[in-house]
Amino acid sequence: RDVAPSRGLGDVYKRQDIIFTEHERIEVIPMSEKITVVALGHRALGTTLPEQKIATKKAAKAVADLVEAGNRVVISHSNGPQVGMIHTAMNEFGKTHPDYTFAPMSVCSAMSQGYIGYDLQTAIRAELISRGIYKPVATILTQVVIDPYDDAFAEPEKIIGRVLTEEEAETEESKGNFVTKLADGTYKRILAAPKPQKIVELETIRTLVDAGQVVIAAGGGGIPVLPQNEELKGASAVIEKDLTSGLMAEMLNADMLMILTSVENVSINYGTPDEKPLEHITVADAKKYIAEGQFGENSMLPKMEAAVSFLEKGIGRTAVITSIDSALAGFQGKTGTIIE
């Protein structure tokens, strides 16, 4: 994946910081005051490095469409398969290197933010430049404070990592970790998924947004941390990405929260003959459907909850849930599930 520069590139490396090619220049682009927070779902990034490279180019087109339409864009993303792969890799390395200290989940989360952010910002920058838009794109390593007394710690349910044998599961439990038995008789580790309370780097994100930069932040819901005196200590947990995205949109006073997933619309009575896609609905409608149990806990429920929370804490806001291919149409109100 890494590329060594060739001596034949000429003026491509004209400036010492090698950020701009010869034809590029920084331009001040007139923008509206609209801020849109875009949350990329786990299927928007693939499950392998080659898939991720392709997927981020697709995501970059959606982001560039929104920038071109006059938005200040902040992007968050899932890290579901990625953080699990990193965690597994660190554990496997530790087995063959006994002196190696196992990487905690908070560190794995930070690693995932770095390498996903790298691919995203590279793809977004390239897509913007191809359209004649010269805007800085930055990834912010983002910590999110959680509540140590959150009920989620009593009932961990987020599955991570590879399949474990019964012996490996017992070893994990002896370390104080939680595991669950799957339907096929194998095991996997599970983590608590507490709600986000505070985004530590919020003012850094706000400063870059106000400066007109495209910002990637709160990847994977953020690195879960707990305040201990002057320090922030990493927590063995994962945070629901959509809830953090909603909180970030709320605290940035964004105009729109756009959650991009694998389907065009949210549906009620999903998977039944009475399935019905939702188009324009109110917050009251959304709360009613949530109360009815219309949405899966690890699927549409956190998305709808994030949308409702964002909308209830501001005036004139819009939430959109749609597919990545329909991002611009969703922004324009032409498709997707639009909640106001």
Regions found by a protein language model. Give the residues of each.
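Intrinsically disordered, low-complexity serine/threonine-rich segments
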Residues: 9-11, 23, 249, 257
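Short, positively charged and aromatic/hydrophobic N-terminal segments
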Residues: 17-27
